[in-house]
Design a protein with these regions (language model features):
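Conserved hydrophobic residues forming the short capping helix/wall of the S-adenosyl-L-methionine
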Residues: 124-128, 191, 220
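SAM-dependent Rossmann-like transferase core, predominantly class I methyltransferases
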Residues: 28-100, 237-248
Length: 250
């Protein structure tokens, strides 16, 4: 987006979207909507479509918000074929396996939790590796701190632990649920400052009204991103509204 007029138009449209976003839910509603599971310290399994993933202790098992991202990867809303893909917070590796099935050229699977990057690598090898031409680089990293200096991505996804209220003090639950909005603004700053997107590249971030939507998206717009909604979803019996944001750089 090198045309100044196009950039100005994208900024106006982004701010118009920003004004329409909902305020955060009350604290008690946020806490009620994010009650932690009690099994994070156990060996588990997780099934998505026809893939069954192993989930060791400490690795988070995906919920409905994660599956919203998985579905958009699988249905082509997020285009991966022939592209370089970075998944921030790779967990047990579902995004990586889907990306291989959708023809991604290479995948950077990042997570701050070492057992999660190991689990992603193991599940990827077992479920996708033998028949896939996609290369996987599992990286244990605080955001992009350990991301290769010369690497760039066409697509980056992040389902951040941006819930604004503390729903637990268990470190594994906090890490996966309620770090807060700062982790997203740091993520966006690093993408911009290190120029991590290829020309025409896209960032997809999942946020709901259990997070500080206005602060996070406002920071993105002020930092030069255009912001669109690629998908939005409500949940039966809940006031939670979840958004998959598509962000682009000039």
């Amino acid at each position: 987006m090198h045309d100044p007029t196009a950039r100005a138009s994208a900024s106006r449209e982004s701010w118009e979207l920003w004004r329409e976003l909902p305020d955060p839910l009350p604290a008690e509603a946020i806490i009620a909507a994010n009650q932690p599971r009690e099994d994070v310290g156990t060996h588990r399994s997780y099934t998505y479509r026809d893939w069954e993933f192993t989930v060791p202790p400490g690795v988070f098992s995906p919920g409905l918000t994660s599956e919203l991202v998985f579905d958009r990867l699988l249905d082509g809303t997020i285009v991966l074929a022939g592209r370089s893909y970075a998944v921030m917070g790779c967990g047990l590796g579902v995004e990586a396996v889907i990306a291989a099935s959708r023809g991604a050229r290479d995948i950077y699977a990042l997570d701050v939790h070492p057992e999660s990057t190991r689990t992603t690598a193991d599940n990827f090898t077992r479920l996708a590796g033998a028949a896939s031409r996609t290369t996987l680089a599992p990286i244990t990293s605080d955001l992009f701190a350990a991301f290769p200096q010369a690497a760039r991505a066409d697509v980056i996804t992040f389902n951040p632990p941006a819930v604004k209220e503390a729903v637990s003090h268990h470190p594994d639950i906090v890490r996966n649920t309620c770090v807060g909005g700062d982790v997203v603004t740091r993520f966006l700053d690093q993408v911009a400052e290190r120029d991590l997107l290829t020309p025409g590249g896209e960032v997809y971030v999942v946020l709901s009204n259990t997070a500080e939507l206005h602060r996070i998206t406002g920071h993105a717009i002020e930092s030069g991103y255009s912001v669109e909604i690629a998908h939005s979803q409500g949940w039966p019996g809940s006031d939670v509204r979840t958004f998959l944001f598509r962000l682009r750089r000039p």
